[in-house]
Structures are given as structure tokens and as C-alpha cells.
């Protein structure tokens, strides 16, 4: 049966409208997909180091950037909850806490803090986080200013704990500084998680400088040192304990460095090794290198701040403070302040790490005191690692 002409025309118009609607749906879907892809992926950065290696300073280099949410050593809460445990037994708990914080899930701290109302000042060293001292966490200080920790502590300590999570979610980069990992294996699940886009900045320092700094702040590090020694503490003479701790630290830094080279190239490209001494000699250039690695713009006011903070007169003896200091003198201080006997013993404990990372041994007190003798070798990173 033939359809009337009006019916044919109506069907034709309906079909054309359906095609047009489908076209607009597909077009809008593609535009939506493109805009979603155009949004920058959130970057998660782990500054991985050890105590007294300049990591607080490196943390501040990231933390003062207006695009960064930064926390300093959140795993401190895990270790202080389980003081009788060992570093290796706590690796998984530390890793799980780090993952949660990267995802801005601050309920993870419930297991490590007293129940009841909390403030953001309940977090260890919270005042070192510019993000917790500016909006949306604390509206008093402008977001794009360099914020001294003393001002932060004075003005923002009463903010409720809930603002930590809110602040975390408002930044493109989440940076955590941690000194409580002793191998890379425990971090594999985070490295392989595509949703995290994890980048590791591995900061190392001359073990002799680390040892000298640890001696001057040993009271602050007593609990951490006991956890590192674990069951070995009772077997070691008191005078041997600092060297054992340094041996463990050196071995762990060495293993982390070597392990990264066995990973697939895609993972190796998310690892950056930085020597503190290189940073001390060329702070602006090395900071630029780290910023570029994680996709941050090196803003002019930050360049000025980095220059000034590394040209002060302080020697950086406090365990957790970052203030103006002469970075080059700090990196060399062990050469005139440590007895050669201690240096010689330390070189035996950390020799492999020193050799691989480019720290030359001294063979006499005369070599140690001769500041014209450069003990930092010109060191090329293997091709597959930045």
C-alpha cells in the first residue's frame, strides 16, 4: 500500500531530525571528552630521602609553590604510634597512609590520632605547609606569598582538621616529603597505580655530612633511630649505634637507587635523583630541574626566594626548621667539625653508597681539611634515569 505524500514527507522530516539530533549528541560528547582530556592530570610527588639530608629544604622548595599542597613527613604519626616496632614492619602501614593522603583522604589519620575534635595543627609540622596557611584552609594569608612558619603557626593553628582535606583537593600537585621508606618494593603499588601519576624525587647527601648533622640533633632523632635499629639495639654498644644506623640508611639509599634501574622505562622516567651538594652549589638551576620534572612553573618570586634562602649565614642545625643559611658552607661543615677517626669509620660503613653516588673518600686528616680538594665527583646519571 502506497503512503500518502504528506505521510512520506512527515517520515522524511522525522528521520532528518533524528540524524541531526544524533550528530549533535556525538559532537557534544566529543567536545566533552576533549575538555576532560585537556584538564591537567593531578600530579603526586614523593620527596624520598633520609633524616638530615636537606629534605626539609627540598620540601619547602615544593611547598612554597602556589600550585602545591605539601605535607612534611605524615608517616611520623605511624612511627610515633608504634614506637616499639621496626621500620620494616611499618613499611606497609606507612605506604597505605601515603596513598590515602595522596588521594586527600585524611580519615586515614583516625588510626594515629586521639579521638575527638582535632585541628589542622594536630598534623606533624603542619606549619611547614603553605597550603594550610592560605585559602581555602586559612583565609588570612594570600596564597601567592612566601609564608614563614612562625606566621602560619600564630595565625592558622585553630582551623578545624576538616580544612586539610578541602585544601588538598583544591591543588593540582600533592607533594609529600618522607624519610621512613627503606626500600622501593613497598612503593611498587603506588608507582604502578595509573590514577596516582606518582613521581619520586630521591634526595641523597654525603653520608659524612648526614652523620655530622645527626650528631648535633640526636635528641630529636632518638625514637626514629631506635625504630631503625629494631632488635639490634640491644646487641650494639652505645658508641656503635650511630654507625649502624648510618649503615642501614646508606644501604637503603643505595638499594632504592639500584632498584629503580631494573624497572620498566616508563617507571624510570618518573624518578629523579638529586644530590644535596649539587643543589647547594646551584640552587636555582637544580630547583628549576625539579620543577620541570613535576610540571611546575618556576615563578619569579620563587626564584628570588630560592636565591635568598641559600645565601644566609645560618648553619641549619635545628632538626626541622628551614631558614636562611649558606647552603655551600652547610654541605662542607663536616670537613672541619668531624674527627678523621669518625670519618674513616663512616666511609667503611657507607663506602658502596658513596662510590656509586659520587662522593670521594678522604685518606687522611690533611685531605679532609683541605677545602680546595673537591670531594664531589662529576657524576653522570645513567641514561635511563633523569
From Swiss-Prot:
Glycosylation sites noted in the Swiss-Prot or TrEMBL record: 30, 308, 329
Reactions catalysed: 3-O-{N-acetyl-beta-D-glucosaminyl-(1->3)-beta-D-galactosyl-(1->3)-N-acetyl-alpha-D-galactosaminyl}-L-threonyl-[protein] + 3'-phosphoadenylyl sulfate = 3-O-{6-O-sulfo-N-acetyl-beta-D-glucosaminyl-(1->3)-beta-D-galactosyl-(1->3)-N-acetyl-alpha-D-galactosaminyl}-L-threonyl-[protein] + adenosine 3',5'-bisphosphate + H(+); 3-O-{N-acetyl-beta-D-glucosaminyl-(1->3)-beta-D-galactosyl-(1->3)-N-acetyl-alpha-D-galactosaminyl}-L-seryl-[protein] + 3'-phosphoadenylyl sulfate = 3-O-{6-O-sulfo-N-acetyl-beta-D-glucosaminyl-(1->3)-beta-D-galactosyl-(1->3)-N-acetyl-alpha-D-galactosaminyl}-L-seryl-[protein] + adenosine 3',5'-bisphosphate + H(+); a 3-O-{beta-D-galactosyl-(1->3)-[N-acetyl-beta-D-glucosaminyl-(1->6)]-N-acetyl-alpha-D-galactosaminyl}-L-threonyl-[protein] + 3'-phosphoadenylyl sulfate = 3-O-{beta-D-galactosyl-(1->3)-[6-O-sulfo-N-acetyl-beta-D-glucosaminyl-(1->6)]-N-acetyl-alpha-D-galactosaminyl}-L-threonyl-[protein] + adenosine 3',5'-bisphosphate + H(+); 3-O-{beta-D-galactosyl-(1->3)-[N-acetyl-beta-D-glucosaminyl-(1->6)]-N-acetyl-alpha-D-galactosaminyl}-L-seryl-[protein] + 3'-phosphoadenylyl sulfate = 3-O-{beta-D-galactosyl-(1->3)-[6-O-sulfo-N-acetyl-beta-D-glucosaminyl-(1->6)]-N-acetyl-alpha-D-galactosaminyl}-L-seryl-[protein] + adenosine 3',5'-bisphosphate + H(+)
Pathway: Protein modification; carbohydrate sulfation
Ranges facing Cytoplasmic side: 1-7
GO cellular component annotations of the record: Golgi membrane; trans-Golgi network
Tissue: Specifically expressed in HEV. Weakly expressed in spleen. Not expressed in other tissues. Expressed in colonic mucinous adenocarcinoma.
Binding site for 3'-phosphoadenylyl sulfate: 51-57, 205-213
Subunit and interaction comment: Monomer.
Other facts: May serve as an anti-inflammatory target.
Known function: Sulfotransferase involved in SELL/L-selectin ligand biosynthesis pathway. Contributes to generate sialyl 6-sulfo Lewis X determinant (also known as MECA-79 epitope) for SELL recognition, a prerequisite for continuous lymphocyte homing into peripheral lymph nodes and antigen immune surveillance.
Protein name, as recorded: Carbohydrate sulfotransferase 4
